[in-house]
Amino acid sequence: MNNTPSHPDIPALVADLARARLEARPLPWPATVPADVPLAYATALAVRAARSEQGDAPVGYKVGFTNRTIWPRYGVYGPIWGTVWRSSLVQIDAAASNEGVISLKGLCEPRIEPEVVFGLREAPPPDCTAAQLVAAIAWVAHGYEIVHTHFPGWKFSAVQAVADGGLHGRLLVGHTVALPAATEPEALIDALAGLRLKLYADGVLKDQGLGANVLDGPVQALLHFVRELRATPGAPALRAGDLITTGTLTDAWPVQAGQRWHTEIAAAGPLAGALKGLAVRFE
C-alpha cells in the first residue's frame, strides 16, 4: 500500500463531508473544491479511515461513470470509484425471493442504478489480464446501487463526485451466481457484455440497458478499476471477499419512498437462466 498523501485542506474537507452525510445537507463547496483528482481521492481515503475508526467497515467498492452514454448528461467523462460500507449494504439471502427493501433515510436526491456486481475469491495479481481477473471472481450478481449527491440538482464536477464518496448511498445485491475457478474467461466476458436489461418503476418501463454500456462490459469495467485502484496513492489492496459494482447499465433515475422498481434480464452463455431480474421497494 502506498502512503496516503497529506494536504492542509484535507481535515476541513473531511469535516464538511462528515456533516453533510450525517445531516443530509448540501456541501458548501465552490466549483474549485477540491482542487484536483489526487486531492479528491486523498480526501475520500481520509473519510474512509475516519469512518472505519468510528466502527463502520468497508466491504468493497463501487465503480461509477463507466457508462459512456451518460457522461455528457452529468459532465463526468471517466470512471471514478468509492467505498461500499457494511452499513450501506443489503444482500438478499439465496433462500428468499429476489426482492429487497431499501431505506432512503439520510440520502440526498437518491437515484437508482441497475448494475452487475462481482465478489472476489482472491485478490487478482498485479497487472492482471482479463483471464486472471475472471479466475479471481467467486460470484456475479445483479444489484442496485442507490446513489446520491450532496450537490443540489446533481450539479458537480468529477473531483467533487470522487470526494463525495463516489456518490455511493446504498447497495442491494441480489442472488449470486457462483463462478468456478475454471470458468472460461471469454464466455463470461461475452455473456456479460451482451446482457440486456429492462428497468421498471411501479410496473412502467423506464429505461433499457446493455452490459456493453459499461466500458464495453462489466469484466472490462472491473479490470479498469483494478488498475486504477493500484495506481491511486494510499488506496487499500483488494482482498478476498471484496465486492465490486461495475456501473449502471442505464441512466440513474430518481427514486422515492413507496415505490417498487424491478428489472428483467436476458443473459446468454454461462449466465443463461441463472442471472435473474431483481426487485426493490423503497421506504
Residue ranges and their predicted role:
Residues 168, 240, 260:
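Active-site lining segments that contact anionic ligands and/or coordinate catalytic metals
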Residues 249-253, 267-272:
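Short, charged beta-turn/beta-strand-edge "cap" motif at the junction between a beta-strand
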